[in-house]
């Protein structure tokens, strides 16, 4: 069981490479990607279709073992120590994995029972649920059935689920997909705030270049899984 460093989690990525079988040989979908992400940074990965955005993020999160290269969390090799480190990692997929026919609070309670340590008391669970609802600005919707939430609210609910276990490292796959511009900006501001106030390193894949000024760092992926840029949003 790995405790998060109070200063947050920094990531060092060295030579991440992935090839898949293709007609006439192999196709490179990650091409020796190396980069650094500082503790508590909010980072967006952008790029064209098929540039390897989600592949890179999944490799960085440790959930894809079929890559070569190394990812270090505060100096610890993520792939070699994944079973120890996975408790500090939150991952929100593009499709919301939440039940529609129960209230938000009930869904969070059931999830907390699974995700939080077994000796957590009911009172501690209740307090944590209230805390994560405040973080994602859904406190007033706690008794709402999930099917009645808007698209943006459902995405926040998915984020709340992953926040229950208090991960220090947080990955999101296209969290703003399908949201209107106002809702998208609101969600981006929430993520930016989480990275600073809750001391979380947040990495997201996005198809849009709107609101990137809210990020600390932008990673641009190019054709063939090549890293084209990694730096401040002001620099590209």
Language-model features: locations:
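Conserved ABC ATPase "signature" region
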Residues: 109, 124-141
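ABC ATPase NBD Q-loop/coupling interface
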Residues: 70-84
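Hydrophobic anchor residue at the start of the ABC signature
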Residues: 159-160, 187
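The feature captures the beta-strand-to-loop junction immediately N-terminal to the Walker
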Residues: 46-49
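Catalytic Walker B motif of ABC-type/P-loop ATPase nucleotide-binding domains
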Residues: 170-173
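A short, proline-enriched helix->beta-strand linker immediately N-terminal to the Walker B motif
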Residues: 164-168
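Q-loop/switch helix immediately C-terminal to the Walker
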Residues: 100-117
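Helix-to-loop junction immediately C-terminal to a conserved catalytic motif
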Residues: 61
């Amino acid at each position: 069981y790995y405790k998060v460093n109070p200063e947050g989690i920094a990531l060092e990525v060295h030579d991440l490479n992935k090839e898949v079988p293709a007609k006439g040989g192999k196709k490179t979908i990650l091409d020796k990607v190396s980069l650094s992400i500082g503790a508590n940074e909010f980072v967006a990965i952008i790029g064209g279709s098929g540039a390897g955005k989600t592949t890179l993020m999944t490799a960085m999160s440790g959930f894809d073992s079929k890559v070569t290269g190394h990812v270090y969390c505060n100096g610890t090799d993520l792939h070699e120590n994944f079973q120890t480190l996975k408790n500090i990692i939150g991952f929100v997929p593009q499709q919301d994995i939440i039940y529609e026919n129960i209230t938000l609070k009930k869904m969070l309670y059931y999830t907390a029972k699974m995700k939080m340590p077994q000796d957590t008391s009911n009172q501690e669970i209740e307090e944590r649920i209230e805390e994560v609802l405040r973080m994602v600005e859904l406190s007033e919707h706690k008794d709402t059935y999930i099917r009645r939430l808007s698209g943006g609210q459902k995405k926040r609910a998915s984020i709340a689920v992953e926040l229950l276990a208090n991960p220090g490292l947080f990955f999101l796959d296209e969290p703003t997909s399908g949201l209107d511009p106002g809702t998208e900006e609101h969600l981006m501001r929430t993520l930016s705030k989480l990275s600073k106030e809750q001391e979380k390193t947040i990495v997201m894949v996005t198809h849009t270049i709107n609101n990137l000024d809210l990020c600390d760092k932008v990673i641009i992926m190019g054709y063939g899984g090549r890293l084209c840029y990694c730096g401040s949003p002001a620099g590209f």
